[in-house]
């Protein structure tokens, strides 16, 4: 199981563990504002906040483990095997593949309040990125600089 922690002094720090014995080839990844994000269920997004984080890049797509956007909103996908369950696509919901959740959210939201509103109609699906990268069993930690305890 992965863990995460925050620390606020005059600045805001966010850290996490990645509890794997090996690397997928993850690297520090920057996604600029106008990078054309394609999603499995949503329309492509051409205008969005810039993102920086740790990701495994597959087929020119950043599969973020954790990241923050230029507004200070951060998210991490933490391993939670046996406790995270995702379903199939649901009609009437905003469907988001688990592998796309972090960039999908950080591209659109500048704060936790914005994220809460956006997430009210979201269905995270078990749709894999591709045949060799199935949906991971994660829970997500969402943080924002002004939401940290003083």
Residue ranges and their predicted role:
Residues 1-94, 126:
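A contiguous strand-loop segment
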Residues 35-36, 89-122:
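Compact, glycine/acidic-enriched structural inserts
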Residues 59-60, 97-98, 134:
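Short, glycine/acidic-rich beta->alpha junctions
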Residues 71-73, 102-103, 136-140:
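Generic beta-strand structural signal
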Residues 116, 122-143:
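Aromatic- and glycine-enriched pocket-lining scaffold segments that form the walls
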Residues 144-150:
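Conserved small/polar residues in nucleotide/adenosyl-binding loops
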């Amino acid at each position: 199981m992965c863990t995460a922690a925050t620390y606020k002094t005059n600045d805001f720090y966010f850290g996490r563990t990645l509890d794997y014995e090996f690397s997928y080839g993850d690297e520090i990844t920057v996604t600029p504002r106008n990078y054309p994000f394609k999603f499995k269920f949503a329309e492509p997004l051409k205008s969005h906040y810039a993102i920086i984080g740790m990701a495994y890049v597959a087929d020119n797509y950043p599969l973020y483990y954790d990241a923050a956007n230029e507004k200070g909103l951060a998210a991490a996908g933490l391993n939670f095997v046996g406790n995270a369950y995702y379903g199939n696509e649901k009609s009437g919901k905003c469907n988001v593949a688990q592998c796309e959740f972090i960039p999908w959210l950080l591209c659109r939201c500048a704060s936790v309040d914005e994220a809460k509103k956006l997430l009210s109609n979201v269905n995270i699906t078990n749709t894999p990125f591709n045949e060799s990268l199935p949906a991971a069993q994660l829970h997500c930690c969402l943080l924002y600089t002004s939401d940290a305890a003083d």
